[in-house]
């Protein structure tokens, strides 16, 4: 015992710091990824809160027409947002010291770039920290793999899409109505609803919600009764107990009779793998779709593809979507474009008579 105490005393300050950082006995695990995660996420969160409350209007389109996004400049929780960095900045790295003054930095939307870049670094480190803690505890690494789906989605809308479009001004605004505006403009310019990767993402999110609700309700409904009929089944259990609290055979039998036998899992591991993989793979595909549409590889275009024997167009749902896309296209950034791209691309009629 004495030798152990002496060895601890002789350990260097750096060694003690390393042991503290990587200790799984801390109430919250820090880890080496946490050393980078904590300051980046604190910075992103602090600047977001300050900018959401008090940032002045931002010249998002680079045409000297600032757009207000903060609460003190007339917005509420729904309409407020951190306005993306100006199109005049493009993809340039724009820290505070690159601007002539803080006022110029705010006018050009510097906070957006600061928040987004720190946030992406922070969530990537959070993913690494999940792996690191799993490694220290001897667990398998799939928690971090599952978290890679939302990380990929955030990276797609905040970094890959602006890179593909040539400006951070095309990134998703950090606010509720700003997110909706981003979605509408994305549909107008890329026809995302007709992209198969987006369809897979919808199936992943809605299917994941359905399977989660089905699984949770089925487990809760098939508890092994440890009590009498006169008291709650909840009284028969204690939090964190080692014994199984529900009967998977009973759940399998119920679900197999409700639908059909092979629609029900009789193996808990394969069931939970399915519950994790379904939404994760769907969101991976959506992030991949956003990242390809960033470079204008857009959704399917079936416009005016059905005609009768006389060559007259028979409108399909695709044509209705196309008309809606044109309407959204001409309305967004209305002062920045003399000719919206979709309309300007049409060949002008001949005037030679």
From Swiss-Prot:
It catalyses: 2 a plastoquinone + 4 hnu + 2 H2O = 2 a plastoquinol + O2. Residues 345-353 form a propeptide. It is an enzyme of class 1 (oxidoreductase). The record marks 161 as: Tyrosine radical intermediate. Chlorophyll a ChlzD1 binds at residue 118. The record marks 344-345 as: Cleavage. This is Photosystem II protein D1. The lineage of its organism: Eukaryota, Viridiplantae, Streptophyta, Embryophyta, Tracheophyta.
């Amino acid at each position: 015992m004495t030798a152990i105490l002496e060895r601890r005393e002789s350990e260097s300050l750096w060694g003690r710091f390393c042991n503290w950082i990587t200790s799984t006995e801390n109430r919250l695990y820090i880890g080496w990824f946490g050393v980078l995660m904590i300051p980046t996420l604190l910075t992103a969160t602090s600047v977001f809160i300050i900018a959401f409350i008090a940032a002045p209007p931002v010249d998002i389109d680079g045409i000297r027409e600032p757009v207000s996004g903060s609460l003190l400049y007339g917005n509420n929780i729904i309409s407020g947002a951190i306005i993306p960095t100006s199109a005049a900045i493009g993809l340039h790295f724009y820290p505070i010291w690159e601007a002539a003054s803080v006022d110029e930095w705010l006018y050009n939307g510097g906070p957006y770039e600061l928040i987004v870049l720190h946030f992406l670094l922070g969530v990537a480190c959070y993913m690494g920290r999940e792996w690191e803690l799993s490694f220290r505890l001897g667990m398998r690494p799939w928690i971090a793999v599952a978290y890679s789906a939302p990380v990929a989605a955030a990276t797609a809308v905040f970094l890959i899409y602006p890179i593909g479009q040539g400006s951070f001004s095309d990134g998703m605004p950090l606010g509720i109505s700003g997110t909706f505006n981003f979605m509408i403009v994305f549909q107008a310019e890329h026809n995302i609803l007709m992209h198969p990767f987006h369809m897979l993402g919808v199936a992943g999110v809605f299917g994941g919600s359905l399977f989660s609700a089905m699984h949770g309700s089925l487990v809760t409904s098939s508890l092994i009764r440890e009590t009498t009929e006169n008291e709650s089944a909840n009284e028969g259990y204690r939090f964190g107990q080692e014994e199984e609290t529900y009967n998977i055979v009973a759940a399998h039998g119920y679900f197999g009779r409700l639908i059909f036998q092979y629609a029900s899992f009789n193996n808990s591991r394969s069931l939970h793998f399915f519950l994790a993989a379904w939404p994760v793979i769907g969101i991976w595909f959506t992030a991949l779709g956003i990242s390809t549409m960033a470079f204008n590889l857009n959704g399917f275009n079936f416009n005016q593809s059905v005609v009768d024997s006389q060559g007259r167009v028979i409108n399909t749902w695709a044509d209705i979507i196309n008309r809606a896309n044109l309407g959204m296209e001409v309305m967004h950034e209305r002062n920045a474009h003399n000719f919206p791209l979709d309309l300007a691309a049409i060949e002008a009629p001949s005037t030679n008579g």
